[in-house]
Amino acid sequence: MADTTGRIPLWLIGTVTGIPVIGSIGIFFYGSYSGLGSSL
């Protein structure tokens, strides 16, 4: 775990790519339930 110099940690990649994906899915389902997603 100490040899992370020069490389991006896997948990950092998962966090940076996971939050926008979960957020967009949450916004999509929230919009569809509130009636905004039906126009997409």
UniProtKB/Swiss-Prot annotation:
Record-annotated membrane-spanning stretches: 8-28
Localization: Plastid, Chloroplast thylakoid membrane
Cited InterPro entries: PSII_PsbJ, PSII_PsbJ_sf
GO biological process: photosynthesis
GO cellular component, one term: photosystem II reaction center
Entries under Gene3D superfamilies matching the protein: 6.10.250.2070
Record function comment: One of the components of the core complex of photosystem II (PSII). PSII is a light-driven water:plastoquinone oxidoreductase that uses light energy to abstract electrons from H(2)O, generating O(2) and a proton gradient subsequently used for ATP formation. It consists of a core antenna complex that captures photons, and an electron transfer chain that converts photonic excitation into a charge separation.
Oligomeric and partner information: PSII is composed of 1 copy each of membrane proteins PsbA, PsbB, PsbC, PsbD, PsbE, PsbF, PsbH, PsbI, PsbJ, PsbK, PsbL, PsbM, PsbT, PsbX, PsbY, PsbZ, Psb30/Ycf12, at least 3 peripheral proteins of the oxygen-evolving complex and a large number of cofactors. It forms dimeric complexes.
Name the UniProt record assigns to this protein: Photosystem II reaction center protein J
Species whose genome carries this gene: Chloranthus spicatus (Chulantree)
Gene: psbJ
